[in-house]
Design a protein with these regions (language model features):
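Carbohydrate-interacting/catalytic domains
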Residues: 2-10, 14-194
Length: 194
């Protein structure tokens, strides 16, 4: 939800792993199924910290919360549409019944940061298939490159990287030489293009 346009809606307690034991309609119960155990915040710090970092990532990237509808075409004549949908192949969405994979490119030039500069582009890959899949990375205009930002696979949550500072040469490695990336099963991967 934190990567979607609009207002993200989290159920109270989601940020620290609260569960209603599979009950999706517990409004009429006044018992431990609906009570929030705030002590879990100290036991489930990994999830809570990850949600905080996702919120900070969302705030940093205005392309994730645009004030208008997206058109899926190049309305600014900048060479890229504001949003585009992809499959395992770049620019070729697969909407077949059995497809469990989708990638979304949000082009940063369509949303400005507070300082007036264009936001970074984001490439969000959803692999809900039960096996790893290879995804093409779309080419970015100019000298922009893809950098890994968020990964949701494995038993732990990866850290969102420290922002790249252009003055320092030490930075997270880009994927400039890669045209593809492998995404593990049932996971989401986000790349930042700058």
């Amino acid at each position: 939800m934190l990567l979607a346009q609009g207002t993200p809606m989290l159920l109270a307690g989601d940020e620290f792993g609260n569960t209603q034991e599979g009950n999706n309609n517990p409004y009429c119960q006044d018992n431990e199924i609906t009570w929030l155990d705030w002590r879990m915040t100290s036991a489930k710090t990994e999830i809570l910290e990850y949600v905080k970092k996702l919120i900070a990532f969302r705030r940093k990237h205005p392309v994730l919360h645009q004030g208008r509808e997206l058109y899926m075409f190049d309305s600014l004549s900048c060479g890229m549409p504001d949003v585009s949908i992809h499959g395992t192949q770049a620019w070729k969405a697969d909407f077949s019944y059995y497809s469990r994979m989708l990638a979304v490119l949000l082009y940063g030039d369509y949303r400005k940061k507070d300082d007036g500069t264009a936001d970074d582009s984001l490439y969000i890959i959803f692999n809900m298939y039960w096996e790893s899949r290879s995804f093409d990375l779309p080419n970015l205009p100019g000298e922009k490159e893809w950098y890994p930002a968020i990964e949701t696979y494995g038993n732990t949550f990866s850290e969102v990287p420290v922002p790249v500072r252009r003055k320092k040469r030490r930075r997270k490695p880009s994927l400039e030489s890669q045209k593809k990336t492998i995404v593990p099963p049932r996971s989401i991967v986000v790349f930042v293009g700058r």
